[in-house]
Regions:
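N-terminal periplasmic/intermembrane-space "pro-region" immediately following the signal or transit peptide
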Residues: 3-64, 380
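Hydrophobic alpha-helical membrane context
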Residues: 14-18, 89, 280, 363
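Intrinsically disordered, low-complexity regions enriched for glutamine and histidine
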Residues: 23, 43-46, 92, 195, ...
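Outer-membrane beta-barrel pore domains
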Residues: 27-29, 64-68, 104, 115-119, ...
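Outer membrane beta-barrel
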Residues: 36-206, 211-218, 222-231, 299-303, ...
Length: 380
């Protein structure tokens, strides 16, 4: 079945790319415009339709954990982008410019998005380049829209952001090709009843070449019975190969629900099978720990003022790095967040969290503590 899906995806990509060559201009346009004129028009359209911008998220944080640094100031994110549309092709180039170059987690300045998508049909759009993996609700969401100061643990650890397997920080992205579309538009309000995504990725994360012949197959489907509500399912069959040549599986599935309307409700569960690179015991040529992990979260929030500038959110966020050990590795975060939109492109966010970390307590450190942070978001 997996080989069949791969073949179908490649065939669809080839078909759409070929079709795009004929869809760029009609026969009448082709007869009236020379190739040079058509090319010049496309370039002008690209220049006119390209927008440039960026955003910055600054953060001041504090905690009461024993043995930890109790306060900090940092630039959480600084990103610049150029995006637009030319004919039927949308494109996006985004860079993250904060961080320390050459850091172990590769958190320095880097390209995060570099993709182009053919969007002639709403039911079949083909995207190629470096982009978000088609896995989970939160992963493709902009940091401005999460409602909290960071993504959930499940999203961070199991969608390729700071992945548990040992992959470098990739912000949920990889290099690949994806087919997606919207099906069955509602006669009442026009929203699509079905959204699907399926793609092949290298499995090595952003800005890295492929290191094995296996391509990660990732896909999902969302059902939207009413506007604003979606029920979603995803699957991921992949492998990651480290710089030292250790290969680990990433076999994962997830299910989630999201509602955006008068209030916001979002929840997801994700299960993963596959060891970490660090789990390999070279001396004994055996794996240690457990190959299974899981995470889940539930969040809800709503505007509390008539102008909707002040919004309050609450969440429960749990992640188990290893399942079926003789002790618990579950880390649970109970959080509340308040954000105030000062202007359209300027907001202030306060996040308060109570953390219960069983794995940290097992190591003899303080695993029950509180954190607070104040974040300032601005766009330009």
């Amino acid at each position: 079945m997996e080989k069949l899906l791969r073949a179908v995806l490649v065939l669809c990509a080839a078909t759409i790319v070929c079709a795009s060559a004929f869809a760029i201009e009609s026969p009448a346009e082709a007869s009236s415009n020379s190739p040079a004129e058509a090319g010049s028009s496309a370039v002008k359209q690209a220049i006119q339709n390209t927008s440039f911008g960026g955003y910055v998220i600054g953060k001041a944080s504090a905690n009461n954990q024993e043995g930890a640094t109790h306060s900090n100031f940092e630039l959480r994110l600084v990103r610049l982008y150029a995006k637009g549309k030319m004919l039927d092709f949308a494109y996006n180039l985004q860079m993250q410019v904060n961080g320390i170059g050459g850091s172990a987690g590769e958190k320095g300045p880097r390209i995060v998005d570099a993709w182009i998508e053919w969007q002639h049909w709403t039911w079949a759009r083909i995207k190629f380049g470096q982009m978000k993996r088609a896995f989970m609700i939160e992963n493709p969401m902009n940091p401005w829209d999460i409602g909290f100061g960071t993504y959930s643990q499940a999203t961070s650890k199991l969608s390729g952001m700071s992945d548990r397997c040992g992959e470098h920080d990739s912000n949920g992205r990889d290099v690949g090709v994806q087919l997606q579309g919207d099906l069955l538009p509602s006669a009442r309000d026009g929203h699509a009843w079905v959204h699907y995504q399926v793609g092949l990725w290298t499995g090595q994360g952003i800005n890295h070449a492929d290191k094995n012949s296996h391509k990660d197959l990732i896909g999902g489907i969302g059902i939207s019975p009413v506007k604003g509500l979606s029920l979603n399912w995803w699957g991921w069959n992949g492998r990651y190969t480290s710089a030292t040549g250790i290969t680990v599986d990433r076999r994962r599935w997830a299910a989630g629900l999201q509602y955006n309307g008068a209030f916001t409700l979002r929840g997801e569960y994700v299960h993963s099978y596959g060891y970490k690179v660090s789990d390999w015991d070279a001396e004994n040529t055996a794996w240690k720990g457990s190959a299974k992990s899981q995470g889940w979260y539930v969040m809800a929030g709503a505007p509390v003022t008539r102008d909707k500038k002040l919004r309050i959110y609450g969440k429960v966020d749990a992640y188990s790095d290893y399942l079926h050990l003789d002790y618990s590795t579950t880390k649970t975060i109970y959080g509340i967040s308040a954000e105030y939109w000062i202007l359209k492109n300027l907001k202030l966010q306060l996040n308060l969290n109570q953390i219960d970390d069983n794995a940290t307590e097992h190591r003899g450190a303080d695993g029950s503590y509180s954190t607070a942070d104040l974040q300032l978001y601005w766009r330009f």
